[in-house]
């Protein structure tokens, strides 16, 4: 079971970091098409809040209906692949929306949700899903819901600051986003390879 708990922490830290890194980077994707005003940041923050909320609800629901870590890992594979593809499709999406919608507030909201809704909602499922899985059966006394959220928040802290303070100055944004997707994909496939459901059942 120690391996399973280590995987829990790996998932929490990794995807806590990835989602916040994506939030920081999204401003660089939006600004060439919708500007860099407070409206854009309002769109970014509110969109990610909606995505988080959807992920929390779905994660909690699926953890009760399908309490298997392999299900979560498979969903994270989908979310990670989506992130890898963002550099390939965000430009035509933003160009189309900017041409069709004159209001930058509505335009940026639309673009944010089309580009980020699926992967961020999936990645936001990690914390509630793990809380739901650990609520079934015996778990160590330290692995409380509060500890799960704390570990995820530590990942978010590092994802935010490493991206803002270092990565943006070193690499093109598209390359960073693709790298985040590859990291998420590697962690998800590693989780599947460990066959975590069999380990949890023991």
Kindly give the residue locations of the regions a language model identified.
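Alpha-helical transmembrane segments of multi-pass membrane proteins
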Residues: 1-202
């Amino acid at each position: 079971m120690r391996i399973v708990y280590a995987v829990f922490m790996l998932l929490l830290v990794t995807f806590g970091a990835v989602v916040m890194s994506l939030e920081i980077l999204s401003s660089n994707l939006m600004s060439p098409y919708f500007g860099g005003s407070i409206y854009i940041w309002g769109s970014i923050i509110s969109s990610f809040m909606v995505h988080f909320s959807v992920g929390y609800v779905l994660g909690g629901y699926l953890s009760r209906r399908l309490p298997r870590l392999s299900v979560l890992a498979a969903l994270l594979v989908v979310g990670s692949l989506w992130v890898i593809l963002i550099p390939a499709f965000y430009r035509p999406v933003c160009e189309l929306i900017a041409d069709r919608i004159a209001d930058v507030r509505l335009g940026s909201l639309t673009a944010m949700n089309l580009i980020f809704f699926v992967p961020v909602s999936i990645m936001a499922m990690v914390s509630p899903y793990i809380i739901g899985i650990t609520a079934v059966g015996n778990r160590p006394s330290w692995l409380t819901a509060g500890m799960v959220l704390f570990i995820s928040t530590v990942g978010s802290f590092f994802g935010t600051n490493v991206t803002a303070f270092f990565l943006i100055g070193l690499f093109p944004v598209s390359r960073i986003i693709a790298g985040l997707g590859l990291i998420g994909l590697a962690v998800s496939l590693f989780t599947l390879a460990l066959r975590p459901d069999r380990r949890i059942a023991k």
